Design a protein with these regions (language model features):
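Recognition helix of helix-turn-helix/homeodomain-like DNA-binding domains
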Residues: 26-42
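The DNA-contacting recognition helix of HTH DNA-binding domains
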Residues: 18-19, 29, 40, 58
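DNA major-groove recognition helix of helix-turn-helix/homeodomain DNA-binding modules
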Residues: 26, 43-63
Length: 264
């Protein structure tokens, strides 16, 4: 998916005004303005013309998107904004902006890769959409799940509904010493919190080979095998989550099996 930033930068490189580009694409200047602000996404037909007219390569030789990374923040943010703007997702749409602001300047581990932290909640939310999960509260909680833990914002102070606050509070690990068993037992009482935690774990497990030391990776595998089957069982008990439960179970188990085979 082409992003507003790509359109704007390529248009300026070509020396085109928004009005001039609009004429070439056969749309209004207002449409171009909205595309560049990621307020709306162009149709597939218009997107293809934008790539051609602006000279933006869709794929690099190695198959990654033209900015060098498949799971790019700009692409994911534009995709989510487009989906949420056209559906009943007021909290999730607000959470998209809020999470980006709060995680500004933070990086995902390992720091050497220079991946903005917001990549993590964005990937999780795209994962949810890919599994057919289109619940406003759940999507907002996915975007906000690390805001309390990593940005110092108390869950009860988040400018969102009580249900979203409760989920974020449940998945936030206390700063002080705590019982891991009690932490997961509390999460297991809330199916949406279970879903947030399982999607989070799936994303974390997928990147632990490059982000964790060997000992930390072993501990993470053991923690996952100990506590996550129960969370997945809770998710499976919710009819609308049944397919997602199967997918997450398959994905997490496959990743763990692969991780165990990595020489350490």
């Amino acid at each position: 998916m082409i992003t507003g930033k790509q359109i704007s930068e390529a248009r300026k490189r070509k020396g085109l005004t928004q009005a001039a580009l609009a004429e070439l694409i056969d749309v209004s200047p207002e449409a171009v303005s909205k595309w560049e602000r990621d307020a709306y996404s162009p149709s597939p037909e218009k997107e293809e013309r934008l790539y051609h007219i602006l000279g933006i390569p869709f794929l690099e030789d190695d198959g990654t998107l033209n900015n060098g990374r498949l799971f790019d923040e700009d692409h994911m943010s534009a995709f989510l904004k487009g989906k949420m703007s056209n559906g009943p997702f007021p909290e999730a749409l607000k959470a998209l902006t809020y999470a980006k602001e709060k995680h500004e300047g933070q990086l995902r581990k390992p720091i050497s890769l220079q991946i903005p932290y917001i990549n993590h909640p964005l990937t999780m939310t795209c994962h949810a959409f890919a599994m057919g999960l289109e619940d406003d509260v759940l999507l907002a909680a996915l975007l906000l799940h690390d805001v309390s833990e990593d940005c110092g914002v108390p869950a009860e102070s988040l400018p969102f509904s009580k249900e979203v606050q409760d989920i974020v509070k449940l998945v936030t690990k206390p700063k002080h010493e705590f019982s891991e068993s009690a932490y997961y037992a509390a999460i297991a009482k809330n199916p949406k919190a279970c879903m947030v935690k399982c999607i989070d774990r799936c994303n974390n497990v997928s990147g632990m080979a490059i982000g964790f030391a060997a000992e930390r990776m072993q501990d993470y595998i053991e923690e996952t095998e100990k506590y996550y089957p129960e969370l997945l069982k809770v998710i499976k008990g919710v009819p609308e989550y049944n397919n997602a439960a199967w997918l997450l179970s398959y994905q997490i188990r496959s990743l763990l099996l692969t991780a165990k085979r990595i020489p350490r």
